[in-house]
UniProtKB/Swiss-Prot annotation:
PTM-bearing positions, type 2-(S-cysteinyl)pyruvic acid O-phosphothioketal: C126
GO biological process per UniProt: cell division; cell wall organization; peptidoglycan biosynthetic process; regulation of cell shape; UDP-N-acetylgalactosamine biosynthetic process
Species of provenance: Sinorhizobium fredii (strain NBRC 101917 / NGR234)
Main location group: cytoplasm
Keyword tags: Cell cycle, Cell division, Cell shape, Cell wall biogenesis/degradation, Cytoplasm, Peptidoglycan synthesis, Pyruvate, Transferase
Catalytic activity: phosphoenolpyruvate + UDP-N-acetyl-alpha-D-glucosamine = UDP-N-acetyl-3-O-(1-carboxyvinyl)-alpha-D-glucosamine + phosphate
EC identifiers of the protein: 2.5.1.7
Single GO MF annotation: UDP-N-acetylglucosamine 1-carboxyvinyltransferase activity
Record: residues binding UDP-N-acetyl-alpha-D-glucosamine: R102, R131, P132, V133, D134, L135, K172, V173, S174, V175, D317, I339
UniProt-annotated binding residues for phosphoenolpyruvate: K22, N23
Name of the featured protein: UDP-N-acetylglucosamine 1-carboxyvinyltransferase
Length: 430
């Protein structure tokens, strides 16, 4: 099993290209099931979750071809992938596939809308809280679907004549459920209005692609999305937006170690709240023609309190990384997690590096320490794993991160990107 070995103490200097967003690519790939034409996606990252979803879509009958090109020697791949689901050969998404990645559950929306039925296993993925599917079920029921849960599967059927537009207000914001309901509503009869919809950039990106396919969606990126159903969707070509979580992660890495790095092919507007928190912590951040420049020279890391919130608030997917940054601050900071009830599993691993963190409910108190010291640590989920890498970059000596398959689910060629900026990071196999 692979591990990541880090020898800390080096500043980061150079250029890091930002990959396409995993959280945008996955729903875009699933949207290909809505049409019998070809959907072409550009800037798709090479990640374990993407490969798993390719297998799942193939199970439903999608014909998939990948054209990869290496953009820079030694760095990442930006891929163009063509999806053609001319015939849906199966409306069942089995446990052995869905259990490995939560987002694969989202196929329920397109399958139900296009084929009138879907049988999808309850999902897997990162073990962060319960993450129930109730909101998905309630939203699809509002479009006329009949849904039952039996034997670990969600069985959904549409009424004769297909789904019907309706109005549904989410009792709490859900990005995944917003994706699913929006996709299903594109082929429903009549108009659907989604209230308290997720405002994340990835939702707006999905709507942009669906509209290019012939959908009629307005309001994506706001709290109210309106979808006028159409009879069918056609193919399209769409470029996946930059990964704001990867952008924020590397910005925090520079703030942690010190240095001067250009984050290329990304946009500051995708993560304004997170960038402001990093500025308050002591980094200088400016926009360039090609992306974002992050600099921290000399000044120490200042303590900053944050609260995670749905977009445009501070992203929960950057909470663990920011906690890593705060372990080296000059005072006491607090991080409150409002999205997931069990997203502090990285605390005990950061403590192995010398961090001083205490928990009270959904709030973590971080007392900055003068130095961290390398140690063996274990990744518990995707974002927690990269927080350990960031901390290891600033720790004295060697840090060895195990269970890095979590990293491979969401960060494309992380060790290569960091190494090119002067970090001592390498992948080792047992």
């Amino acid at each position: 099993m692979d591990r990541i070995r880090i020898v800390g103490g080096n500043q980061l200097h150079g250029v890091i290209p930002i990959s396409g967003a995993k959280n945008a690519a996955l729903p875009l790939m699933i949207a290909s099931l809505l049409t019998d034409d070809t959907l072409t996606l550009e800037n798709v990252p090479h990640l374990a979750d993407v490969e798993q979803l390719i297998r799942i879509l193939g199970n439903h009958g999608a014909d998939i071809s990948v054209n990869g090109r290496r953009e820079r020697q030694g760095e990442s791949y930006a891929r163009t992938i063509h999806f053609t689901s001319r015939n849906i050969v199966s409306t069942t998404a089995p446990y052995e596939l869905v259990s490995k990645m939560r987002a694969s559950f989202w196929v329920i929306g397109p399958l139900l809308a296009r084929e009138g039925k879907a049988r999808v296993s309850l999902p897997g993925g990162c073990a962060i809280g319960t993450r129930p599917v109730d909101l998905f079920i309630e939203g699809l029921t509002a479009l006329g679907a009949n849904i039952e849960i039996d034997g670990g599967y969600v069985n959904a059927t549409a009424p004769e004549g297909g789904l019907t537009g309706g109005r549904y207000v989410f009792p709490k914001v859900s990005v995944g459920a917003t994706h699913v309901l929006m996709m299903a509503a594109t082929l429903a009869n009549g108009t659907t209005v989604i209230g308290n919809a997720a405002r994340e950039p990835e939702v707006a990106d999905l709507a942009k692609c669906l509209n290019a396919m012939g959908a009629k969606i307005t309001g994506a990126g706001t709290g109210t999305i309106t979808i006028e159903g159409v009879r069918s969707l056609s193919g399209a070509r769409h470029r996946v937006l930059p990964d704001r979580i990867e952008t924020g992660t590397y910005a925090m890495a520079v703030a942690m170690t010190g240095g001067d790095v250009i984050l290329e092919d990304t946009e500051a507007s995708l993560l304004d709240t997170a960038l402001e928190a990093i500025r308050r912590a002591g980094a200088e951040i400016s926009e360039t023609n090609s992306g974002i420049r992050v600099v921290r020279n000399g000044a120490g890391i200042r303590p900053v309190d944050i609260v995670t919130d749905p977009f445009p608030g501070f992203p929960t997917d950057l909470q663990a990384q920011f906690m890593g940054l705060m372990t080296k601050s000059s005072g006491v900071s607090h991080i409150t997690e409002t999205i997931f009830e069990n997203r502090f599993m990285h605390v005990q691993e950061l403590a192995r590096l010398g961090a001083k963190i205490s928990l009270s409910g959904q709030t973590a108190k971080i007392e900055g320490v003068g130095r961290l010291k390398g140690a063996p640590v274990m990744a518990t989920d995707l974002r927690a794993s990269v927080s350990l890498v960031i901390a290891g970059l600033a720790a004295e000596g060697e840090t060895m991160v195990s269970r890095v398959y979590h990293l491979d689910r969401g960060f494309e060629r992380l060790e290569e990107k960091l190494t090119r900026c002067g970090a001592h990071v390498e992948r080792v196999s047992d």
